[in-house]
Regions:
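Short histidine-centered loop motifs in beta-beta connectors
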Residues: 40-42, 198, 204-212
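Short aromatic-glycine motifs in intrinsically disordered, low-complexity regions
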Residues: 63, 180-188
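Pseudouridine synthases involved in rRNA/tRNA modification
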Residues: 1-29, 188-191, 201-206, 214, ...
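Conserved hydrophobic positions within beta-strands
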Residues: 74, 159, 196-199, 232
Length: 280
């Protein structure tokens, strides 16, 4: 499938592709296979681009997941991105029964003949926003800015107890739990992990918190709040004993980033699920 890129400023075509943090080897292969065109004509990597030019890349891909017929809650879509409000109780990718399979079905119905790519992950019971990326260049771009913490990802969670401070930060490294598979722990030898939070509602037993991730470690929110004595409601793996929910209450509610093609800031919000209530 071919994807078009409207050029805004004069630039060498190779430098333009490198601006997406796309690897030199992949760029070389695009030109070697004659997949890059300018205004309808095949070009080489020495070509200069001008404002208003239409660069076209043929990615020669096909859908790589088995399609699964289910509804998608799509909150944003253009030629480069598909942002979805993920429901609970579904994993991101698997051979047959995952969000990627549902996206594959959507691609098939809409003649989007591209690999199914996601920029980040959400756990099975986490609801909310997840970015699928149609364009390989844009995936490379997002991966870079996720690593440099320039994509803003905000969450809502309900945790046990009342926190001591209305807002704060948890700056504790996270590593593997050697005794329990698929569990993380705070560890001096772990990777840097920083979680910022602010209480938005509370009662004597529970707190609803808004969370901003500075880093994106696996289970970061769940591990950090468990470590400070406030595990997420429903998160049995990390110590919740309340039995108030059959899933942990964590929702990816806002994502914002600069669009690599238009340079506009994209900001998307997903409504908080109905089961996110703490009462009086």
């Amino acid at each position: 499938m071919k994807i078009n890129y409207k050029i805004k400023n004069s630039i060498n075509v190779r430098d333009y592709l490198l601006s997406f943090y796309y690897s030199s080897s992949k760029i070389y292969k695009l030109f070697l296979d004659k997949k890059v065109s300018l205004n309808g004509e095949i070009i080489n990597e020495r070509k200069e681009l001008n404002s208003g030019d239409i660069l076209e890349i043929d990615y020669d891909e096909e859908i790589d997941y088995k399609p699964l017929e289910k509804d998608l809650d799509i909150l944003y879509e253009d030629d480069y991105f598909l942002i979805i409000n993920k429901p609970k109780n579904i994993i991101i990718h698997d051979e047959n029964n995952s969000l990627c399979n549902i996206v594959a079905n959507y691609y098939k119905k809409n003649n989007i003949n591209l690999n199914v790519r996601f920029a980040h992950r959400l756990d099975k019971d986490t609801t909310g926003l997840i970015i699928f990326v149609k364009c390989p260049l844009c995936l490379s771009y997002l991966n870079h800015f996720i690593e440099t913490h320039e994509i803003r990802r905000e969450y809502i969670a309900i945790v046990n107890g009342k926190l001591n401070n209305k807002k704060g930060s948890i700056d504790l490294p996270i590593g593997e739990d050697r005794h329990i598979s698929n569990k993380k722990i705070v560890s001096k030898t772990g990777k840097k992990a920083v979680t910022h939070y602010e209480i938005i509602e509370e009662n004597n037993k529970y707190s609803m918190v808004k969370i901003l991730l500075e880093t994106g470690r696996t289970h970061q929110i769940r591990c950090h709040f468990s470590h400070i004595g406030h595990p997420l409601i429903g998160d049995v793996l990390y110590g919740d004993k309340s039995k108030l929910s059959n899933r942990y209450l964590l929702h990816s509610y806002k994502i914002s980033f600069v669009h690599p093609i238009t340079n506009e800031r994209i900001e998307i919000e997903a409504k908080i699920p109905l089961d996110f209530k703490i009462g009086k």
